[in-house]
């Protein structure tokens, strides 16, 4: 059986004990592979992504334990974490008060003993996509079951920047989408229709101004940047405040 070397720790591995990556490197399953999240597709990952993901978990777990986990027990409604997940899988905790979201895996060293958690922490404001999809999968009895997922993609993120979160029902997926929509101020309700209309008008004015400046031959970089920012705020919601909250927390962990 062919022998290879783990590109991270240097351990000798074979086809059974090693995981081959997309760039041809191998990592050991026993140690380095276990450091990664189950949600990470190691087959299509390259070595730099694996090492960045491991560093992402080390930092994220520290932030989870020191900042977010204590908020689970907070008596303040404004500080409470919003939890989304399914039994046996990773859970997503959304913290509007800190501007952070954490994907958390729970592990046990022996059966139900030696519980420990590891986490990837993201800035909510970096969330680029949160889309619902469903899949038909076989259960333990061989019968087909419909599984519900939310696909999340984050900008400005090294390591695992995208993952599929399995939730128990379509209703739970809708609740997660609503949670993010409310944070970004883009929920489709009468109460927020004026805010949405204002963002749309600001975007249209900026684009119109940029077009006029271009026609007059005096378009500058600031006008383009402003127009792009206003269009982005209309499509994605104004994320200035939620990003500022996250950066205030993360500054302590750089």
What residues fall within each predicted segment?
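Phosphoinositide-binding peripheral membrane targeting modules
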Residues: 100-143
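Acidic, Ser/Thr- and proline-rich intrinsically disordered linker/docking segments
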Residues: 128-254
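Short, compositionally biased strand/turn segments
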Residues: 88-115, 235-242, 246-249
């Amino acid at each position: 059986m062919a022998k290879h070397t783990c590109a991270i720790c240097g351990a000798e591995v074979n086809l059974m004990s090693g995981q081959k990556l997309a760039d041809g490197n191998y990592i050991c399953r026993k140690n380095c592979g276990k450091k990664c999240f189950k949600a990470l597709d190691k087959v299509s990952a390259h070595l730099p992504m694996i090492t960045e993901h491991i560093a992402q978990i080390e930092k994220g777990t520290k932030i989870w334990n020191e900042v977010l986990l204590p908020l689970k027990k907070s008596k303040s409604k404004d500080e409470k974490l919003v939890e989304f997940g399914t039994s046996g899988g990773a859970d997503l905790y959304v913290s509007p008060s800190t501007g952070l979201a954490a994907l958390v895996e729970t592990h046990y060293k022996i059966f139900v003993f030696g519980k420990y958690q590891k986490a990837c922490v993201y800035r909510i404001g970096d969330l680029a996509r949160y889309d619902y999809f469903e899949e038909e999968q076989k259960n333990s009895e061989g019968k087909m079951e419909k599984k519900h997922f939310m696909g999340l993609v984050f900008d400005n993120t090294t390591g695992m920047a995208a993952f599929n979160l399995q939730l128990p029902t379509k209703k739970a997926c809708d609740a997660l989408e609503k949670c993010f929509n409310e944070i970004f101020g883009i929920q489709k309700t009468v109460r927020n229709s004026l805010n949405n209309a204002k963002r749309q008008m600001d975007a249209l004015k900026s684009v119109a101004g940029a077009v006029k400046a271009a026609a007059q031959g005096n378009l500058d970089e600031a006008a383009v940047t402003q127009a792009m920012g206003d269009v982005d705020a209309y499509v994605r919601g104004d994320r200035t405040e939620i990003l500022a909250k996250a950066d205030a927390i993360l500054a302590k962990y750089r």
